[in-house]
Every structure is written in C-alpha cells, then in structure tokens.
C-alpha cells in the first residue's frame, strides 16, 4: 500500500524526461534558424585586404559569390589571367610610373609623354649649317653659293627640271631616269667588249645601162636633125602614151646633153650626111645678077 500511495523516484524521472522531449523537439527549429542566420551574418575575409576587381583590370561591377570561401581563390586567379589578356592596352601609364628616354646613352625618365617628346627634341636638333661655311652649286657654269643646305637644294631645282635626261657617254643615248640608264649601260658595255658585228651588206647597185652600139642608133642612120631624141616608130594613142617611151635615166633630153657629150659620136658617114644637110640648109644667099648665077636665069 505504501508503494501505491506515492510515485517512486524512478517513475518521476522517466515522466520528467518524457515531458522534456517535446520541448527539445520544439526548440530545435529555432536553433537551426539562428545557426543559419549566424552563418549568413558571419563576415568573410577582410575586404580591405583583397584589392577591388577594377585594380586588377577586371570589370567595374562585382557580383557576390554565394559561397565566399569556395570561390574566393577562383575569382582572384580568373581576374588576373583572362581579364588582363582581353583588355585593351593602356595608353596612359599608371600614376607614379616613369617613361625612360629611348635615346642611346640617356638615362632620363619622365612622368608623361609630353615631357618625353620635349626632351627628345634636344637629341634631334634641326639641321643647321656651320658658321662661315658656304655650299656651292655643282652645276656647270654656275658660281652660286648658299649659307645652308636647304637653300642649295631649292636652287638645285632650277637646274634639274622635270624634263631632264641622262645621257650615255658611249652611244650618246638619252634616258629619263637613272634606272633606265643603268640598265642600258650593261647592254652598252657588253656590246663594247664584244667585237662589232659586220656591217650590213650594201644594197645591190643598179646595173649600168648598156650603151647602144653606134650602128643601132636610128637617128644617125636616118639623118634626123635631133639625134639625141628617140623617134617614135609608131603613133600610139590612149592614156598609156607617156609610159611607152620614157626618157632615158629619168631625165629630160636637154639635161642629158652634158652627160652624153663624151660618148663616142656616130660614124663618119653619118657625120658627112649631117654636115651636108646642115650646109645645104645654112648656105648664104647669092646676090642676084652675079657671075655665079645659073645659065637659065633671066637677066
């Protein structure tokens, strides 16, 4: 009866433990929520320790990674490798960088390109003539002299005009440019070293016209008053008349007389006939009533 009157200590312990279990199960979601909040609010690595992305040459916008611990290393390596390869080259040097002079023997450096350009002018001064030195013109029959090379070049344009030419000293041929003259000199020198080719054969001269024998001269045999002219054997008519009997040697008969004066004359018989006919025609008139009058004449 005493055992039933009051619960034992063991039963009380079991009841308390069973009553506390729902409380623990109810409180477990709260603990999980606080754990997730703490994990989200847990700060990552110090942002000041990692330089911003634009300093490493990447884009200006930065996207937060959902898992900062896992993608921290990948973002740094990715920004250094690919972004630097794809970006445009920088025209302006970063602040604090000095640009060295590229002239040999000069170790100066400048913060900007403008300062470097002004410094380079000291290494490349404009061309100036020496004091007291005169530049003379090299053209023939020209005695002009100038204090600077620029004036001499401007003066040289007066001698060498666009229609200038270059002459070969061997064959006296003229060329427009030096290159064409040099090409010709190779050919001209080769021809000068080789023996000259034989001259081309002269044109065949026209065979001399054979002289007619004296016996075949019809004028001498007929006793014509003009032995130098060829008589026409017939009287041809038509448009071919001037082509049938052309003058010998292509000259008119009056112009042939000095050339044919040295030719042998006709035989003695024809000469006698010529003199006889000439004497008969050119005999002087006899006076009328003279002693030489014919016997049958009227007195």
UniProtKB/Swiss-Prot annotation:
Biased composition (Low complexity): 217-228
UniProt keyword annotation of Transferase present: no
Major localization listed first in the record, in broad terms: nucleus
Basic and acidic residues composition-biased segments: 203-215
Cellular-component GO terms for this entry: nucleus
Keyword list, A-Z: DNA-binding, Metal-binding, Nucleus, Repeat, Transcription, Transcription regulation, Zinc, Zinc-finger
Chain spans, region Disordered: 1-102, 193-228, 254-299
Keyword Zinc-finger in annotation: yes
PROSITE patterns reported in the protein's UniProt record: ZINC_FINGER_C2H2_1, ZINC_FINGER_C2H2_2
Biased composition (Polar residues): 1-20, 70-80, 268-285
GO molecular function terms listed in the Swiss-Prot or TrEMBL record: DNA binding; zinc ion binding
Family designation: Belongs to the krueppel C2H2-type zinc-finger protein family.
Role noted for this protein: May be involved in transcriptional regulation.
Protein name: Zinc finger protein 414
Species of origin: Rattus norvegicus
């Amino acid at each position: 009866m005493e055992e039933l009157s009051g619960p034992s200590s063991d039963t009380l312990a079991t009841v308390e433990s069973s009553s506390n279990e729902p409380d623990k199960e109810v409180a477990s979601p709260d603990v999980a929520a606080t754990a997730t909040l703490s994990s989200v609010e847990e700060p990552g690595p110090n942002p000041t320790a990692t330089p911003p992305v634009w300093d490493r040459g990447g884009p200006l916008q930065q996207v937060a990674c959902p898992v900062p611990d896992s993608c921290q290393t990948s973002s740094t390596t990715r920004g250094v490798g690919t972004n630097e390869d794809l970006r445009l080259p920088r025209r302006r040097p970063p602040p604090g960088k000095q640009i060295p002079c590229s002239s040999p023997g000069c170790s100066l450096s400048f913060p900007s390109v403008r300062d470097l350009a002004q410094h380079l002018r000291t290494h490349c001064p404009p061309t100036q003539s020496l004091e007291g030195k005169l530049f003379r013109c090299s053209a023939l029959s020209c005695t002009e002299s100038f204090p600077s090379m620029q004036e001499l070049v401007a003066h040289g344009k007066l001698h060498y005009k666009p229609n200038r030419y270059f002459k070969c000293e061997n064959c006296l041929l003229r060329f427009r440019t030096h290159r064409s003259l040099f090409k010709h000199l190779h050919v001209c020198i080769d021809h000068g070293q080789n023996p000259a080719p034989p001259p081309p054969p002269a044109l065949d001269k026209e065979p001399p016209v054979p002289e007619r024998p004296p016996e075949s001269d019809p004028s001498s045999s007929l006793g014509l008053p003009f032995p130098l002219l060829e008589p026409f054997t017939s009287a041809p008519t038509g448009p071919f008349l001037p082509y049938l009997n052309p003058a010998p040697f292509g000259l008119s008969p009056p112009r042939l007389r000095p050339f044919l004066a040295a030719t042998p004359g006709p035989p003695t018989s024809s000469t006698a006939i010529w003199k006889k006919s000439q004497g008969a025609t050119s005999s002087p008139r006899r006076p009328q009533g003279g002693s030489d009058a014919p016997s049958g004449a009227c007195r």
